[in-house]
Every structure is written in structure tokens, then in C-alpha cells.
Amino acid sequence: MEFWQHIYSNFNVIAFSIFGLKVHWYGIMYVIALLLALLLAKFFVKKFQLDINEKHLDSYFIWVEIGVILGARLGYILIYDANTMYYITHPWQIFNPYINGEFVGIRGMSYHGAIIGFLIATLLFCKKYKTNPWIFLDLVALSVPLAYVFGRIGNFLNQELFGRITNVPWGIYVDGILRHPSQLYEAFLEGIVVFIIVYLARFKQSFQGELILVYAGAYSLARFICEFYREPDFGIGFVLWGMSMGQILSFIMFITALLVYICIKFKKVNI
């Protein structure tokens, strides 16, 4: 366990450089996650014979990727970043990948902000092409969780979003302090476990939109649990009743998904 506990001391967050441009492992994991999500979506379209053509699917993923990036970055700045006012007065710095002249990529993304950007992009896309948004949302619920695993592995390799102080033997040292590898807990619970739940729910699906609601509920519950092992965001700490901002947002997400599910499932609301 000695090597594992000191893995950050023996690992470079930069995978390689091209003409002086440093390529980080996080960026590589992000690209893998994006491609895997698209490939899984195409697989599930064929497997479950969904009424989505490949051209629309490719276009849709471009739309939602833009929405996710915008939502994730803006969400982080508005919710988590300690320099919110700076970015509001200097909006051109929001997507600036350079710090002191060095390319470091775009840092600081919020998952809950990404969700909002994703939903807006989905609604705009479906309105433009006159398609049913619930079909696409259910497809995303199936294809995203496994891809999400690579996103959290990317966080781990980038040595960010680390866990709380611990004494468990599988902990890792971060700046000389033993901490939970919470990114890997999240990869398992929020990625693999959530996928299994959504995939099994597909075979008992009773209405369009059910899978995305199951995903939202399962993810928010998994995230709420993982937050107990994840270090609260810098500058925010614990917000209410000993809960982190991630837990509060996950709680809101869970209640929202549950209420919508109940309204549709038991009150026969047309969608």
C-alpha cells in the first residue's frame, strides 16, 4: 500500500507535451468520457430500437456538450468560486485556459451547473428539430453514467476534488496528509452503481422520461453519500446543518426528481 498511498508523489498530471502545449491526463479522460457516452448512446439506440436517427444523435451531442461546458463553468463560478465578482466584471476570463502565460486548461466545473446547461441545450435542440426531449433524456440516462466514471478518474489523476482526512489503509497522501480517494468512490457509486440502477429500470420502464428521473434520483443519492468522504469546496466549507454545498444541491435534485416522478407516475400527467 506504500506506493498507492504516495501515488501523487510519483505521478505527473501532465501526460505529454506537443510543441510546448501540455496535455493533462484530465483532458484525456474527458475526451474518453465524451466519446464513450456517444458510442454507448448509439449502441442503446440500436439495442432498444429508439426513434432517433444517427444524424440527429450526433448533432444532439454537440449541442449538449456546449451546454454542459457552459453550464458547468458558469455554475462553478456562481456557486463555488471565491472570485465570483472578478469573473462577473471580467467575463472574458471565464474560459481563459492560461494562468500567468502557462496553459493549464479550464479548471473549475460544477456538475449541477452542467445539468442545467444540459437540460437547456436539450430543450433548445428538441424545439428546433421538433423532437420529443424525453426520448433523448432517457438515452442520456443510459449512456452517461459509465462515461462519468472516466471523468472522476480524471479528477483523481488531476489531483483535485480529493477526500477528507482519514486513517484508512487505502488513503492517499495529499500534501503530506492522508485523505480518502473520494474521486474513486464517486466513480464507483455515481458511475457504475447508477448505471446498473438505470439499466435495470429500463426493463420496467412505464413512461417516457422515467429513466432520466431514475438517474437524477440515483445520482443525487450517490453524490450525497460520497460528499461525506469528499473535502468540502475551498472557501465554502459546510453550508447548512453540517452539509456541504454538493449535498444541498443533491438534496434539491433528489426532491425535484422524486416530485416529478410521482406527478407523472401516479397522477397520470401527460408529457
Curated annotation (Swiss-Prot):
Gene Ontology CC terms: plasma membrane
EC number: 2.5.1.145
Associated pathway: Protein modification; lipoprotein biosynthesis (diacylglyceryl transfer)
GO MF entries: phosphatidylglycerol-prolipoprotein diacylglyceryl transferase activity
Main location: membrane
GO biological process: lipoprotein biosynthetic process
TM annotation in the entry: 25-45, 60-80, 103-123, 134-154, 181-201, 209-229, 235-255
Family matches, as PROSITE patterns: LGT (PS01311)
Keyword Membrane found: yes
InterPro entries on file: Lgt
Topology of the protein relative to the lipid bilayer: Multi-pass membrane protein
UniProt keywords, alphabetically: Cell inner membrane, Cell membrane, Membrane, Transferase, Transmembrane, Transmembrane helix
Disulfide bonds listed in the record: none
Residues engaged in binding a 1,2-diacyl-sn-glycero-3-phospho-(1'-sn-glycerol): 152
Family of the protein in this entry: Belongs to the Lgt family.
Function recorded in the entry: Catalyzes the transfer of the diacylglyceryl group from phosphatidylglycerol to the sulfhydryl group of the N-terminal cysteine of a prolipoprotein, the first step in the formation of mature lipoproteins.
PANTHER family: PHOSPHATIDYLGLYCEROL--PROLIPOPROTEIN DIACYLGLYCERYL TRANSFERASE, PROLIPOPROTEIN DIACYLGLYCERYL TRANSFERASE
Name of protein: Phosphatidylglycerol--prolipoprotein diacylglyceryl transferase
Organism the protein comes from: Campylobacter jejuni subsp. jejuni serotype O:23/36 (strain 81-176)
